[in-house]
Amino acid sequence: MKIHEYQAKDILAKYGVAVPRGEVANTLEEAMDVAKRLFAEGAKGVVVKAQIHAGGRGKGGGVKVAKTLEEAEQYAKQILGMQLVTHQTGPQGQKVQRLLIEETAAIDRELYLGIVLDRAAAKLVFMASQAGGMEIEEVAAKDPSAIFKAYIDPAVGFQAYQARQLAFALGLKPTQINDAVKFMMGLYKAYMDTDASLLEINPFITTKDDKLFALDCKINFDDNAMFRHKDLKELRDIAEEDPLEVEASKYALNYIKLDGNIACMVNGAGLAMATMDIIQYAGGMPANFLDVGGGANQQQIEHAFEILLSDKNVQAVFINIFGGILRVDTLAHGVVGAAQKLNVKVPIVLRLEGTNVEEGRKILKDSGLNFIVGDTMQDAAQKVVAAAKGQ
């Protein structure tokens, strides 16, 4: 689950992590009230920041520095309500429905801090880099040595000596080391207490008077742990999420919309990724990732079908099922029911193997509907790509 920057900063502030003074605003009037208050309290400028669930806001024109109240009003009018396009939103962009108005900081250095799970090491890793303000993936690709890492032993947690090592690696001044250690320990505690899956401070800044701030931050939470955090669950902003993904989550379906025209319905995340790969290998483009899981019932299959066909870009559907816990006949009943109910106009290609596969194939054959069956994954992928092209 993603949250907004202002929400992440509110959480971090409770753990003693220094963040700039600021408040969220939902209207122009609220934005100006915050800006007036900050200027009255001695701010030399304010930053007007679009609040959307995407990175690259600055490059897209969603972050502006205002040195006067007039400039703040100009930028707030410009950004609030705009369709902000970044490298993470896609060409359609995301509508800005709220702003964060913050006091500017006298930046001396821009650094990076982050905590994430390293699956290869089976441990959390606390990362730091002197290349702040840049995408960390870009830094890792160009110069992996620029990222310093401290692996966290789950038995003892993140230790102060590790924080000191990272602080020295960042080249912080001796007078800043103790504050940096407290800063990092606060980040780690926030990460653990909230069942986060990602925590990034980018940039983590030092100021000309040797203070440390989280100038921008991002926190994602583990969806599977949200039953323990009702307060955090309330921070979810459904308006920032894809409507089809929101609909899928209601039925415990793992759905992610993509940019292609071949819809995929698969059981199992690994097979789903392999299915997307083989579609591309055959010359097509997947329209989504959809894992219906091993315990899907007929009703979930029907809902999955409705969601797939709600995407206007879909020209064909590829159903790739290896029946184990999810029996093939159960899937077949769901597919036939959905196809009849929705009066499906696009070609449907199936590759079926596993438990009750013969019963499933018979259900499809007896339905009288024009399903296309592939003998293998490769055969089915080639058929669905051809069908999407109208061949």
Swiss-Prot record:
SUPFAM superfamilies: Glutathione synthetase ATP-binding domain-like, Succinyl-CoA synthetase domains
PANTHER family: SUCCINATE--COA LIGASE [GDP-FORMING] SUBUNIT BETA, MITOCHONDRIAL, SUCCINYL-COA SYNTHETASE BETA CHAIN
Cofactor remark: Binds 1 Mg(2+) ion per subunit.
Stated name of the protein: Succinate--CoA ligase [ADP-forming] subunit beta
Cofactor: Mg(2+)
E.C. number: 6.2.1.5
Taxonomic source organism: Acidobacterium capsulatum (strain ATCC 51196 / DSM 11244 / BCRC 80197 / JCM 7670 / NBRC 15755 / NCIMB 13165 / 161)
Entry keyword Cell membrane: no
NCBIfam families assigned: PRK00696.1, sucCoAbeta
Binding site for Mg(2+): N202, D216
Enzyme class: ligase
Role, per record: Succinyl-CoA synthetase functions in the citric acid cycle (TCA), coupling the hydrolysis of succinyl-CoA to the synthesis of either ATP or GTP and thus represents the only step of substrate-level phosphorylation in the TCA. The beta subunit provides nucleotide specificity of the enzyme and binds the substrate succinate, while the binding sites for coenzyme A and phosphate are found in the alpha subunit.
Residue positions binding ATP: K49, G56, R57, G58, E102, A105, E110
Residues at which substrate binds: N267, G324, I325, L326
